[in-house]
Amino acid sequence: MERRFGLASGKEETLEAIGKSYSITRERVRQIENDAMRRLKRPNTLGEARQIFSSLAKHLDDHGGVSEEQKLFNSLADGRLHNHVNFLMALADGVTRSGEDDKYHHRWYTKKEAREAAEQIIERTIDKLAESKKPITRERLFGIMKDNARSLMGDSPSEDSLDSYLATSKLIKQN
């Protein structure tokens, strides 16, 4: 786990690199990693770390329940500790990592519904921006996002939440 998450060196290692050093396959390393995570997640193993996990979830909830990974890590710790934050997030119950794709950066969320709502708000905002094909101010962008949120969720998220949603998108850039 130390090498996989880069807890000592600050540099994460691939399954393949770890496997080569032990002369085992990367699939075997994956199995060992999964077993170690399962064991670490046992209720009697983590004890005092539960408070940290609930604080991480609350931090995410305070930002709309969704946050782009680097933005989240930067808001929680100095860069040299990001690997440790990543490890804690991976252990935490109630938070889930969503992988990167063509539209979105790596992101963490507390509830599937929050992630889906954020994605719908972003997608509707992209559609609206495509209609005008012109740059707009940040205030106007947030206005569009608030309108989309109201039509989807019935109310408007906070500025922090909208900023968090915006950071997840690869398709909307800010100048």
Where are these regions (language model features)?
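C-terminal non-catalytic scaffold/interaction domains in large multidomain proteins
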Residues: 2-175
